[in-house]
């Protein structure tokens, strides 16, 4: 592949290191891997070690937690309205948590610095 894009899903993978190895395997030399996701502070070291492959050269590394919080704030009311109007009351709390609205677990973790949102880009080394 010329490019692999992974957005907000790798935190659910059982083996991040294996995922990164597979990305490296399927990328053509010179290909790009773009990744954005969230991590708890406790998981950062494990995640960083998964990215430490000789074949992948880090070309962009940015913490975008502040921007994500701002985006969540900007769409808070719209999400709350959509949930109230379209989701059965019995499961609205779960939807609010999943949506990251204000006072949800993930929103509070970002605010308190217990979780971060990261953006990285890599290029596969050309041999």
Residue ranges and their predicted role:
Residues 2:
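Conserved acidic residues
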Residues 5:
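A conserved beta-strand element that flanks and buttresses the S-adenosyl-L-methionine
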Residues 9:
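Hydrophobic adenine-recognition pocket in adenosine-nucleotide-binding enzymes
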Residues 17-32:
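A short glycine-rich, Lys/Arg-flanked "PGG" loop and its adjoining helix->strand segment in the class I
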Residues 32-54:
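Conserved class I S-adenosyl-L-methionine
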Residues 56-67:
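Conserved S-adenosyl-L-methionine
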Residues 65-127:
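Conserved Class I S-adenosyl-L-methionine
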């Amino acid at each position: 592949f010329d490019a692999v894009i992974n957005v907000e899903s790798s935190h659910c993978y059982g083996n991040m290191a294996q995922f990164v190895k597979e990305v490296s395997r399927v990328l053509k030399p010179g290909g790009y891997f773009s990744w954005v996701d969230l991590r708890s502070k406790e998981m950062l070291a494990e995640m960083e070690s998964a990215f430490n492959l000789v074949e992948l050269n880090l070309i962009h590394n940015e913490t975008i937690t502040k921007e994500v919080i701002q985006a969540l704030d900007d769409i808070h009311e719209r999400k709350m309205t959509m949930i109230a109007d379209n989701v059965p009351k019995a499961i609205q709390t779960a939807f609010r948590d999943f949506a990251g609205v204000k006072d949800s677990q993930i929103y509070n973790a970002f605010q308190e610095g217990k979780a971060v949102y990261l953006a990285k880009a890599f290029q596969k080394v050309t041999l």
